[in-house]
Amino acid sequence: MAKRIIYNENARRALERGIDILAEAVAVTLGPKGRNVVLEKKFGAPQIVNDGVTIAKEIELEDHIENTGVALIRQAASKTNDAAGDGTTTATVLAHAIVKEGLRNVAAGANAILLKRGIDKATGFLVDRIKEHARPVEDSKSIAQVGSISAGNDDEVGQMIAEAMDKVGKEGVISLEEGKSVTTELEITEGMRFDKGYISPYFATDPERMEAIFDEPFLLLTDKKIALVQDLVPVLEQVARAGRPLVIIAEDIEKEALATLVVNRLRGVLNVAAVKAPGFGDRRKAMLEDIAILTGGQLITEDAGLKLENTKLESLGKARRITITKDSTTIVAEGNDVAVKGRVEQIRRQMEETESSYDKEKLQERLAKLSGGVAVVKVGAATETEMKDKKLRLEDAINATKAAVEEGIVPGGGTTLAHLTPELEVWANSNLKDEELTGALIVARALPAPLKRIAENAGQNGAVIAERVKEKAFNVGFNAATNEFVDMFEAGIVDPAKVTRSALQNAASIAGMVLTTECIVVDKPEPKDNAPAGAGAGGGDFDY
């Protein structure tokens, strides 16, 4: 395909036009009085969102060069989303402001490479300052504040996430599901839970609720298919003599073996239930080993030279209670703390080594299940459109609270960045010179941009508000919900330091790339052929 090549100022201006379009579409959502954006969907109802990265992903322009600008700034939003899970709109607004300021200097003849170096040094200084100003999150009140700000000033959601964090701890997983009612509910599971239920409904011990509940059961874990009942007979006899229930977790149980277990269960010979192993492939084996460590048992696998028919009672796991429904199993075990701690450390090391975000997520889930912490927020809404919007807001809120626990909190509402402007100017003037100094001052002029936009979305004069905030103490900022200047910590308007830091780093990185662009190569749009007369009108020889 033929290419179109654009140089110098023309290239940068075309990128800027694309960035302007995206930044404006995203910036309308910023702050407590930010509006929503409606996204048309090819299939189904339109989606109403208030989430920067979701809007950025939807924007595709006709002009290839402008579209390149959109793609670059979209990267700032999605990288911030990957790192901190929130702050995507802030990253977009910041990147836009740095690009705008920077392009003026490049057009006036400044050296773009030295400007970029100044921008990078300024970012390094600001990251350190954010770290110094961050306060650790100590109580659930602070967590609730972070959660409610990220969910669009919804105090109920903040409270719910704080409660979930309190129950499942730092390592725990808080997952989102679409609820069945209009209200949003929180469900907390004690113990390890996985999404596999009993193989046959005949295993249910409570016919009304269709649940199988076992107290003090033995647990047989194997990664093979159980085809012959003869393999199980020795274990079943030992368990029957011990007079305790047995739960079998295996890859699968074939009809013959399953029928025998069901008959024994119905006749009251043996209280037994069978469940398919969770996961698949290597992950299935790892999860079975997790369950074995949690219950103090052994995974019966031929890789380790262990056979089902030779299994002794000592190899079986023991749990305090196991609850099985048609689509989930919950194991509550205790007393194997040392082994579990060792396993948790091992999973943590794997998380540090892996590059894949998917693997990281799965390892985090395993970590949470071992630590005994899984909370499910069931999102409730009257319509599907509202449900999707709520789900995105809740996702941001959960990510923001986790980020706050990791690196602490700073004053929110764009306040921190605005207050750092004078600090950066003083530092840059005494440590940098020439065009590097200009690069750092570009960042200083761009820092109040998120605060200005929050004020403008609330119907105020952004530039005036930003100047007034800079004159006040570090913790004092502009509360756009009430149009007052308040102590942000006391008012509960806080941002996770990690979110502010990630937004700044990614914005500066992308802006630096745009400023140092000298040439763009894009596909040349193909001329549209005029369709021949009569085409598409339906041939006369066919009946339709």
UniProtKB/Swiss-Prot annotation:
Region span, Disordered: 525-544
PROSITE patterns registered for this protein in UniProt: CHAPERONINS_CPN60 (PS00296)
Subunit structure, as described in the record: Forms a cylinder of 14 subunits composed of two heptameric rings stacked back-to-back. Interacts with the co-chaperonin GroES.
Biased composition (Gly residues): 535-544
Protein name (record): Chaperonin GroEL 1
NCBIfam families, A to Z: GroEL (TIGR02348), PRK00013.1 (NF000592), PRK12849.1 (NF009487), PRK12850.1 (NF009488), PRK12851.1 (NF009489)
Matching Pfam families: Cpn60_TCP1
Function text: Together with its co-chaperonin GroES, plays an essential role in assisting protein folding. The GroEL-GroES system forms a nano-cage that allows encapsulation of the non-native substrate proteins and provides a physical environment optimized to promote and accelerate protein folding.
Binding site for ATP: T29, L30, G31, P32, D86, G87, T88, T89, T90, G413, N479, A480, A481, D495
